[in-house]
């Protein structure tokens, strides 16, 4: 049985608890949220993980695993201290590692605690193949992200383009993964995950498109190297509770927790 504490009780966290509420091998003990959201979180936790308690931080708890589903800010506030205490962690908000020094702080904390932090694949597939290809040497990795035009509301694209007036797919960004993550932090998780599995933030090429005709999030990865080459296209349906998040992100957390809890892992 795997005893899990989770940071976050938003769309992703609730989706994870919903899918695992009938799995006896995964038990949620603590759900960590900001103080001003505790009442709302208690209602959700009571329905989805009635054995768990809601708290603002981990206290002296030592779960088997701490999983982050809360956003970039949670890494510094909760994940780094947990790693230093020797608690294994999983991270959904991989885009946070594009922030200067964050990847190094996570690694240093895990080393000090004698534990490990796992970066989850989230909304993208073939990360295992890309990471394996890196062993033999990669020459080029290109990530293209296409989303409905309104999915880019609240980003720099809204200042550069009239998103409601677009009539065709429009490139809103082209550059490195590091710059993409800096300019579009709420849309950076996939680009950052691809980068960290492959050539890194400064050598991974990224193109982002706003498409008025798109009804789903489309992720395309091209990779070439000593292994040969591959192309992957994924058409992800957005999470109903948060259209900026792919439903596959929730499924990837559930799979990762199942792999830790169950006798067979794949």
From Swiss-Prot:
Catalytic residue list: 219
The protein's enzyme class: oxidoreductase
EC number(s) on file: 1.4.1.21
Coiled-coil ranges per UniProt: none
Residues where NAD(+) binds: 123, 189
GO annotation, biological process: NAD biosynthetic process
GO molecular function: aspartate dehydrogenase activity; NAD binding; NADP binding; oxidoreductase activity, acting on the CH-NH2 group of donors, NAD or NADP as acceptor
Matching SUPFAM superfamilies: Glyceraldehyde-3-phosphate dehydrogenase-like, C-terminal domain (SSF55347), NAD(P)-binding Rossmann-fold domains (SSF51735)
Keyword ATP-binding applies: no
Entry keywords, A to Z: NAD, NADP, Oxidoreductase, Pyridine nucleotide biosynthesis
Reaction(s) catalysed by this chain's protein: L-aspartate + NADP(+) + H2O = oxaloacetate + NH4(+) + NADPH + H(+); L-aspartate + NAD(+) + H2O = oxaloacetate + NH4(+) + NADH + H(+)
Pathway: Cofactor biosynthesis; NAD(+) biosynthesis; iminoaspartate from L-aspartate (dehydrogenase route): step 1/1
Similarity-based family: Belongs to the L-aspartate dehydrogenase family.
Task performed by this protein: Specifically catalyzes the NAD or NADP-dependent dehydrogenation of L-aspartate to iminoaspartate.
Misc: The iminoaspartate product is unstable in aqueous solution and can decompose to oxaloacetate and ammonia.
UniProt protein name: L-aspartate dehydrogenase
Organism (species): Cupriavidus necator (strain ATCC 17699 / DSM 428 / KCTC 22496 / NCIMB 10442 / H16 / Stanier 337) (Ralstonia eutropha)
Taxonomic classification: Bacteria, Pseudomonadati, Pseudomonadota, Betaproteobacteria, Burkholderiales
